[in-house]
Amino acid sequence: MAGVCDMAPNFLSPSEDQALGLALGREVALNCTAWVFSRPQCPQPSVQWLKDGLALGNGSHFSLHEDFWVSANFSEIVSSVLVLNLTNAEDYGTFTCSVWNVSSHSFTLWRAGPAGHVAAVLASLLVLVVLLLVALLYVKCRLNMLLWYQDTYGEVEMNDGKLYDAYVSYSDCPEDRKFVNFILKPQLERRRGYKLFLEDRDLLPRAEPSADLLVNLSRCRRLIVVLSDAFLSRPWCSQSFREGLCRLLELTRRPIFITFEGQRREPIHPALRLLRQHRHLVTLVLWKPGSVTPSSDFWKELQLALPRKVQYRPVEGDPQTRLQDDKDPMLIVRGRAAQGRGMESELDPDPEGDLGVRGPVFGEPPTPLQETRICIGESHGSEMDVSDLGSRNYSARTDFYCLVSEDDV
């Protein structure tokens, strides 16, 4: 029977080693449950707690609760709960329970620092700073990003039969003429490559639009209206602007209205109030005192409202001369190309024909030809290579020479 009583217990809890980080002042309950095989002649099983390999003595900082359950087949379940009050650093350590000198898995208690909010506060501040930077970059770079997207993926409006990029309507007063001809037109045409159609007439008259106005609008991709004080002072702007705007929206898509900062003062003109109410149908661009700078937001917003401009790369070279180091084979004299500037004058073997040398570049007076005596029967094959002229396509080059046949003469 002694062998039956020596059967090792089976620990149900803890099933594995556990490590618990607890702050000072906390209370923790450690549960040790084991299944043992018991007979009447076997000693009563008991649970003993060990701390760091030593038996746990009596103390006021812990308490024990033991329970026993007897089941069939002479088996018994014993449970012990150790409740610890972590009041000082000596209460931490490695705890194990033992039944019949057989130890269970361990509970390792280590001291954790007090729950602090420093990390959470720092993380929140970091997220807030990142959001502020993103918002600042969006405000500062929004127009640049939109321009980049338009230049890269925007719709190309080229083969639509239009002759002009924008129709510009303005008042026939000195201030508006100066603004359009000395600020708006140079910036859009010279710096940004747009083609404008300027006209100082009433664009939104009360009567039906004239045939000339319809034709001119049909030739332009966009419409720009300079809403200056002189433009708004016209009687129809206060009386029938709504009817004119409805008629204008039928003729062109999303017209562009240039307003001025001084017009924002109260009372607001009825036409401006109407345009702000229909902002989803029109484009309003505000001119400020600092908008004259080419890099200001005014020009960026105006360019976003205008069609996309396509930049063409220069052609690498004429296919006819690409294999000749981009030199015209008809202009190769004595094995090297005739340069426009910085080259001594070469004799022309045939001044009356089509094998002449390249003329002087812009602004330079023509170099007088030297009188030479050339016999018709002399051979000049060493001075000019014309062996492959018959196989070339001369119709592709019209800037330097032109070949004619006897029938044309």
Swiss-Prot record:
Residues 162-306 form the TIR domain. Its main location: membrane. Expressed at high levels in kidney, and at moderate levels in colon, small intestine, lung, spleen and liver. Not expressed in brain and muscle. Expressed at high levels in epithelial cells, at moderate levels in splenocytes, and at low or undetectable levels in fibroblasts or endothelial cells. Expressed in mucosal and dendritic cells. Glycans are attached at N31, N58, N73, N85, N101. SMART domains: TIR. Residues 139-409 are cytoplasmic. Pfam families: Ig_2, TIR. Acts as a negative regulator of the Toll-like and IL-1R receptor signaling pathways. Attenuates the recruitment of receptor-proximal signaling components to the TLR4 receptor, probably through an TIR-TIR domain interaction with TLR4. Through its extracellular domain interferes with the heterodimerization of Il1R1 and IL1RAP. This is Single Ig IL-1-related receptor.
